[in-house]
């Protein structure tokens, strides 16, 4: 066997398809509306901006390795025990820590057909095998998940609400899923868009985590709180899981600005409610307008819509994306999520929302 001439990554790493974020620029277009990453058009709380500026006065100091101020703010506003909260550099880091902590080669995770790409990436990075199960009508199928569980299953990932569909699983179904899982299987509830949901049959998962040893819930500050640039996530989990994750977590995984701005953001309930009200108004308007144009829209409870395009080549999702991009509107292609003829659109500023509708009206003529 020939000796390698340079360092080699471990087996499987080069088989991982790298995550591709939503594009931000269009060549030759000066003014661009980025509607591809589900960012809030209202931005963060003014209090979060001020806390961020104040944190800049102490950059010579290491951050609090326990992120105590942020964990206290989360605990107080959510009514939780601070000991059950761990913060991370985005919920992506926390999902990765879960996989590093609980997966080994030969283990399996279950992800759903249109599930968030990071679940698969982190599973493979840990040397385990992701098993994909079908969804039903663009919604998570509990029976399909339970049928996919084997002796090798260690983690089940559920995005609720789901991305890129914007659909949600009623909480009785989440409870049914949990009841059907072996006690050693970890159920991960990724509730990144929970704050946007206003449905009586939806719960983010706090009670289920509180009363069980094999359920965790992850949340983010990148959506309703408008702080994706600071990368802030948190997990609510049983103490034994928090303890295990802390053993491999980096000692200063949260920076000072993120801790300060996050604490201020989650305490500003008025800004959150303002953001929810804005989203509800324009989500409904966009859904109605796209439907009027003859486009099918998957019913969404989030801050984005999945728009389905006709089968004819002249009006495909790819053609629509090119048309919109030339006019400065960047939506997200979702072929990699199993929707080759759909685009995902963030609810954006009013002028962008109206502009996309006007552009698609012209495109579909």
Curated annotation (Swiss-Prot):
The protein's required cofactors: pyridoxal 5'-phosphate
UniProt GO MF annotations: histidinol-phosphate transaminase activity; pyridoxal phosphate binding
Residue list for modification N6-(pyridoxal phosphate)lysine: 223
A GO biological process held by the record: L-histidine biosynthetic process
Keyword tags: Amino-acid biosynthesis, Aminotransferase, Histidine biosynthesis, Pyridoxal phosphate, Transferase
InterPro entries cross-referenced by the UniProt entry: Aminotransferase_I/II_large (IPR004839), HisP_aminotrans (IPR005861), HistidinolP_aminotransfase (IPR050106), PyrdxlP-dep_Trfase (IPR015424), PyrdxlP-dep_Trfase_major (IPR015421), PyrdxlP-dep_Trfase_small (IPR015422)
The keyword rRNA processing is annotated on this UniProt entry: no
Reaction(s) the record says it catalyses: L-histidinol phosphate + 2-oxoglutarate = 3-(imidazol-4-yl)-2-oxopropyl phosphate + L-glutamate
Pathway the protein takes part in: Amino-acid biosynthesis; L-histidine biosynthesis; L-histidine from 5-phospho-alpha-D-ribose 1-diphosphate: step 7/9
EC number(s) from the headed UniProt entry: 2.6.1.9
HAMAP family, sorted: HisC_aminotrans_2
Description of how the protein assembles with itself and partners: Homodimer.
Similarity field: Belongs to the class-II pyridoxal-phosphate-dependent aminotransferase family. Histidinol-phosphate aminotransferase subfamily.
Protein name per its UniProtKB record: Histidinol-phosphate aminotransferase
Gene symbol of the encoding locus: hisC
């Amino acid at each position: 066997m020939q000796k390698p001439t340079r360092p080699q990554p471990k087996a499987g790493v080069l088989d991982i398809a790298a995550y591709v974020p939503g594009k931000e620029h269009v060549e030759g277009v000066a003014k661009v509306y980025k509607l591809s990453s589900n960012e809030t058009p209202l931005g963060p709380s003014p209090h979060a901006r001020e806390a961020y500026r104040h944190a800049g006065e102490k950059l010579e100091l290491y951050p609090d390795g326990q992120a105590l101020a942020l964990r206290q703010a989360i605990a107080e506003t959510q009514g939780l025990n601070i000991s059950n909260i761990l913060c991370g550099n985005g919920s992506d880091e926390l999902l990765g820590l879960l996989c590093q902590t609980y997966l080994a080669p030969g283990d399996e995770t279950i992800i759903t057909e249109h599930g968030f790409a990071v679940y698969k990436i982190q599973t493979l990075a840990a040397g385990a095998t992701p098993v994909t199960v079908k969804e039903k009508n663009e919604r998570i199928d509990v029976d399909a998940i339970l049928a996919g569980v084997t002796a090798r299953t260690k983690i089940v990932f559920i995005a609720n609400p789901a991305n890129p569909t914007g659909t949600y699983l009623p909480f009785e179904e989440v409870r049914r899923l949990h009841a059907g899982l072996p006690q050693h299987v970890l159920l991960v509830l990724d509730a990144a868009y929970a704050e946007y949901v206003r449905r009586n049959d939806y719960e983010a998962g706090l009670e289920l985590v509180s009363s069980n040893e094999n359920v965790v819930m992850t949340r983010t500050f990148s959506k309703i709180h408008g702080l994706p640039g600071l990368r802030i996530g948190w997990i609510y989990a049983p103490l034994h899981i928090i303890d295990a994750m802390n053993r491999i977590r980096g000692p200063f995984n949260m920076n000072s600005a993120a801790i300060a701005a996050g604490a201020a953001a989650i305490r500003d309930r008025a800004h959150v409610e303002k953001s929810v009200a804005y989203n509800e108004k324009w989500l409904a308007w966009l859904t109605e307008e796209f439907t009027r144009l003859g486009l099918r829209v998957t019913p969404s409870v989030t801050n984005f819509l999945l728009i389905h395009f006709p089968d004819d080549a002249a009006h495909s999702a790819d053609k629509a994306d090119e048309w919109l991009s030339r006019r400065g509107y960047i939506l997200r292609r979702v072929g990699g999520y199993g929707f080759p003829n759909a685009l995902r659109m963030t609810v954006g500023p009013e002028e962008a929302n109206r502009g996309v509708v006007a552009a698609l009206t012209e495109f579909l003529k």
